[in-house]
Amino acid sequence: MTDLEANVLAAAQGKVGAAALPNLYSGYADMAYDLDLMGKVVDLAPYLTAKEKAAYVDGFLSEGDLMNNGELKIFPVAKSTELLYLNATDWAPFAAATGVTYDNLATMEGVVEVARQYYDWTDAMTSTPNDGKAFFGRDALANYLLCGAQEMGLTIFDTKNGVMTLHFDKDVIRKLWDNFYVPYIKGWFGASGRFRSDDVKTGNLLAYVGSSASSPFFPAQVMTSDAESHAIEPAILPCPSFAGCSPVAAQQGAGMIVTKGTDAQIRACVEFLKWFTQPENNIAFSVNSGYLPVTHAAANLNAIQASGLELTDIVTQVLDLSLDAVEHDALYTTHAFLEGPRPASPCKMP
């Protein structure tokens, strides 16, 4: 729990010494759910017309429907999804030697096979047996499990009105296992630093799936020792999905929560949020902070480029791929439930 969440919760509980509960604050679904159980959260659905709701990306609004009953308890302001980041410089000699291409990284099954080939290719560089290098990792393991299961038609945490039903199909879970844990155990996948971009920087990985908001952290060089390093260029690719399945994109990012107050206070918060998510305002805020706008009009690369913001080539690639994912892929995030999962954290395997 962050300091912000702890302070808001203390205010909601009326603890001695706590500040007054704010009218509006930034938070995730789990925190909104906890406050909603206390009767502190405003349903914003009645304050928006059908036309106003239609302006927002559907999946972003649905996250705020905590109980799946048509309410809106979290207002979207900026979001992110996941992409595949690749060290294109060190990929080049591997690709030339083995014939693999970026197309092989479109599916999880393809990533596993490429990782196997990379391990064997690097293993053959020395006379020491079984010293091949890992190819791939993920920042958020939970996203792989939940979105991967969703692609295969399984909702692991199926929530309705705050009540969760657990679905754990053996075949689906086995496929998730075979395409992550098995290659990890074999040394084809890896995780050692706090984030997978750290592992790329140290040369321990060549590729990883991470947040679209994390592109500024992709390293400019690989440091193979305290005295040796070389510059690298990134390649940004779509997040791999399972073969034969329609892609499901993770949606991430805090939203705005309005707490109960006077009618004037609530309406003021709603008007601010509507203004804040108007395309020109939302583009400036979201893109400058590394996130994606939340309306259809703003979540458009042409609109962003026309806004006058200076975009690097990498940022343009990230936006292009991310916006395509949120507009065309199914978006998924877990709905909150009692003692449910908190926002995805970096994956560090034991």
Enumerate the language-model features and the residues they cover.
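Hinge/lid segment of periplasmic solute-binding proteins
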Residues: 23, 27-83, 127-128, 149, ...
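C-terminal capping/gating helix-and-loop segments adjacent to ligand/active sites or protein-protein/ligand interfaces
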Residues: 250, 313-350
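Extracytoplasmic/periplasmic substrate-recognition and gating elements
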Residues: 13, 70, 186, 225-298
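Conserved N-terminal structural module of periplasmic/extracytoplasmic solute-binding proteins
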Residues: 1-37, 50-53, 243, 267, ...
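Paired acidic/hydrophobic, glycine-rich loop segments that form the ligand-binding mouth/hinge
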Residues: 23-26, 206-211
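Short, solvent-exposed loop/beta-turn-alpha elements that line the ligand-binding surface or hinge
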Residues: 45-58, 93, 100-106, 129, ...
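Extracytoplasmic/periplasmic solute-binding protein
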Residues: 67-77, 82, 109-165
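Glycine-centered hinge/linker elements that transmit conformational signals in sensory
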Residues: 112-119, 159-193
